[in-house]
Amino acid sequence: MNEYLLLLISTVLVNNFVLVKFLGLCPFMGVSSKLESAIGMSMATTFVLTLASILSYLVNQYLLLPFDLSYLRTMSFILVIAVVVQFTEMVVQKTSAALHRALGIYLPLITTNCAVLGVALLNVNEKHDFIQSAIFGFGAALGFSLVLILFSAMRERLAAADVPLPFKGGAIAMITAGLMSLAFMGFTGLVK
């Protein structure tokens, strides 16, 4: 139990996929201008990352490894991710049309979010079992969501602030992301 808790904490805080591994930067910068869309994207990405992590583990263990098809790992994981994203898009469209419109193109772009594929591939490389894969995927999703929501809240405050003209827009966003990354470096010694 303690091992699973450490894996979750390390994935969320210490080895955050956005701020430490620099994966998932496209939605991080693209959807973070409004808090409402960032929360929706966080929920969708959490669902996709967790489910894709679990399904990728199952595909790898029960299809690719027994038939010695490990060379198809990346392609099969992309296929799994695409199916999960399409399922998520259908669910979001049926349950909340406003959220579907707010997320726009970023919802189908979860398919190309390198963090989702990165989690699936890292599960294999780190030889996680089923429960560890689920926790790793969920932790990565929580870390992504935490950073996206915090960053979105800061960007909304910066939009109303008196920022010097050369720093408006993307420049101040990059500076803020860098400062967030430095803040998350403080968690480095938390988990070994």
From Swiss-Prot:
<keyword id="KW-1003">Cell membrane</keyword>
<protein>
    <recommendedName>
        <fullName>Ion-translocating oxidoreductase complex subunit A</fullName>
        <ecNumber>7.-.-.-</ecNumber>
    </recommendedName>
</protein>
<keyword id="KW-0249">Electron transport</keyword>
<comment type="similarity">
    <text>Belongs to the NqrDE/RnfAE family.</text>
</comment>
<feature type="transmembrane region" description="Helical">
    <location>
        <begin position="134"/>
        <end position="154"/>
    </location>
</feature>
<feature type="transmembrane region" description="Helical">
    <location>
        <begin position="39"/>
        <end position="59"/>
    </location>
</feature>
<keyword id="KW-0812">Transmembrane</keyword>
<dbReference type="InterPro" id="IPR011293">
    <property type="entry name" value="Ion_transpt_RnfA/RsxA"/>
</dbReference>
<keyword id="KW-1133">Transmembrane helix</keyword>
<comment type="subunit">
    <text>The complex is composed of six subunits: RnfA, RnfB, RnfC, RnfD, RnfE and RnfG.</text>
</comment>
<dbReference type="GO" id="GO:0005886">
    <property type="term" value="C:plasma membrane"/>
</dbReference>
<dbReference type="InterPro" id="IPR003667">
    <property type="entry name" value="NqrDE/RnfAE"/>
</dbReference>
<feature type="transmembrane region" description="Helical">
    <location>
        <begin position="5"/>
        <end position="25"/>
    </location>
</feature>
<keyword id="KW-0997">Cell inner membrane</keyword>
<keyword id="KW-1278">Translocase</keyword>
<keyword id="KW-0813">Transport</keyword>
<feature type="transmembrane region" description="Helical">
    <location>
        <begin position="65"/>
        <end position="85"/>
    </location>
</feature>
<comment type="function">
    <text>Part of a membrane-bound complex that couples electron transfer with translocation of ions across the membrane.</text>
</comment>
<keyword id="KW-0472">Membrane</keyword>
<dbReference type="Pfam" id="PF02508">
    <property type="entry name" value="Rnf-Nqr"/>
</dbReference>
<feature type="transmembrane region" description="Helical">
    <location>
        <begin position="171"/>
        <end position="191"/>
    </location>
</feature>
<dbReference type="InterPro" id="IPR050133">
    <property type="entry name" value="NqrDE/RnfAE_oxidrdctase"/>
</dbReference>
<dbReference type="GO" id="GO:0022900">
    <property type="term" value="P:electron transport chain"/>
</dbReference>
<feature type="transmembrane region" description="Helical">
    <location>
        <begin position="102"/>
        <end position="122"/>
    </location>
</feature>
